[in-house]
Design a protein with these regions (language model features):
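Non-catalytic C-terminal interaction segments of nucleic acid-processing enzymes
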Residues: 124, 137-145, 151-236
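Nuclease-adjacent, charged terminal/linker segments that flank catalytic cores
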Residues: 1-64, 233-236
Length: 236
């Protein structure tokens, strides 16, 4: 909240949370595997209220509560977002919910519901990349389908997968072997400590490099790709 300049007082924040809970716009959940941690999420009534105010939404209002695994993924992805926000280089963070809405309801979507599409400003230039936080591995057949989608992506050149451990990193490198698009892989803990300067490995080379150098290498594609770009900016 402080990073978004929405609240600076803890008491004011707590009072706001209590009011939202009282009006059943938020749901309070205790997560057993989080050492008595508590998570607040938007309720169905809260989601309905936000839809009425023009927020992006894709999916059923009748879905049940998310599993603890999904909650943990969301919290750890949020840590990644906050770490990048603190650097001051983040321009836009488009979350999966907005991406899914765009993909399902418009003609200017991406090829995949990424965990986030990130825009950062480095050395006076804006760079975008797709971000995936792969907390647990998928079946190999799933990665074959993902590879085919990534091969057709035209909105950006860079793809970053963050993972919790090195074994999973190597598994993903192998899963993306043969993909003509370069996909980069790094450790989540390194990103939290170094953000864009973290060391990454690609599916095309065993040599590690800083992800910041990957983003800034070469020239950016010029802006102004016609109506498609103009419309896309509305969503990012």
């Amino acid at each position: 909240m402080r990073l978004e300049y929405c609240a600076f007082s803890r008491n004011a924040f707590d009072n706001r949370i209590r009011r939202l809970l009282a009006h059943e716009l938020l749901v309070r959940r205790e997560i057993p595997n989080m050492n008595r941690g508590v998570v607040y999420s938007i309720s169905r009534a809260g989601a309905s209220e936000m839809i009425g105010k023009g927020e992006f939404f894709s999916g059923s209002m009748d879905k049940g509560e998310p599993s603890s695994v999904h909650v943990q993924h969301a919290l750890e992805l949020n840590d990644i977002h906050i770490a990048l926000k603190r650097t001051g280089v983040l321009v836009r963070w488009t979350p999966e919910s907005d991406i899914r809405s765009r993909n399902e309801f418009t003609e200017i979507g991406y090829v995949k519901d990424y965990d986030a599409v990130v825009a950062v400003r480095l050395d006076g230039h804006e760079h975008r990349f797709a971000l995936e936080y792969e907390r647990t591995p998928k079946a190999k057949a799933r990665y074959q389908a993902i590879r085919k989608r990534i091969e057709t992506e035209t909105e950006f050149r860079h793809f970053l997968y963050l993972v919790p451990n090195y074994d999973l990193l190597l598994f993903l490198v192998r899963a993306f072997e043969g993909c003509p698009r370069t996909v980069y892989f790094g450790l989540r803990k390194d990103f939290l400590a170094e953000t864009l300067s973290l060391s990454v490995q690609s599916n095309h080379s065993p040599v590690s490099t800083a992800f910041r150098a990957v983003l800034t290498a070469g020239s950016l594609r010029p802006n102004g790709r016609g109506a498609r770009s103009a419309q896309a900016a509305l969503f990012t």
